[in-house]
């Protein structure tokens, strides 16, 4: 099952798991509606591929001007062959520690695979496999 990040966050809400306040943007006109988020706000491309941050698809906006600018830059962007058609705007969090966990299916071994890293998701997507426990 491939989920966009915002779909996963809707599951958080369903099961009362804390997560930052957010808003979906499907076109730039959506920015005319009240945002109702506290700055800084993270502008996140919604594509089903890793490396969004490195590709410029995740940016932190400190005010409405940056939010508009980053939304214009990211919406419609191509990230590894995936066109960005939806943005997730999310209140930035004060992150003390970051971890990465991924659940997937190893088809060659015919078993489930859980990957963990104490370095956060950027490590995993930066080819530092020696730091990932699976």
Language model feature labels by segment:
Residues 1-22:
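N-terminal, positively charged regions that mediate nucleic acid binding
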Residues 5-12, 37-53, 81-95, 101:
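ATP-grasp fold ATP-binding core
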Residues 20-22, 43-70, 100, 123-126:
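Glycine-rich phosphate-binding loop of ATP-grasp-fold ATP-dependent ligases
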Residues 82-126:
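Hydrophobic alpha-helical hairpins/lids featuring a short glycine-rich hinge
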Residues 31-36:
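Short amphipathic alpha-helix with an adjacent loop that forms part of the alpha/beta core around
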Residues 74-77:
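Catalytic core of tubulin tyrosine ligase-like
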């Amino acid at each position: 099952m491939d989920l966009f990040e915002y779909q996963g966050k809707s599951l958080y809400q369903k099961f009362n798991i804390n997560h930052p306040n957010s808003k979906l943007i499907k076109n730039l006109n959506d920015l005319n509606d009240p945002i109702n988020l506290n700055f800084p706000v993270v502008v996140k491309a919604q594509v089903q591929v890793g490396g969004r941050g490195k590709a410029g698809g995740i940016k932190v906006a400190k005010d409405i001007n940056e939010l508009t600018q980053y939304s214009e830059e990211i919406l419609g962007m191509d990230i590894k062959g995936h066109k960005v058609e939806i943005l997730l705007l999310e209140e930035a969090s004060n992150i003390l520690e970051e971890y990465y966990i991924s659940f997937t299916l190893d088809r060659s071994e015919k078993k489930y695979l859980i990957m963990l890293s104490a370095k956060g998701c950027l490590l995993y997507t930066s080819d530092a496999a020696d730091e990932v426990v699976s």
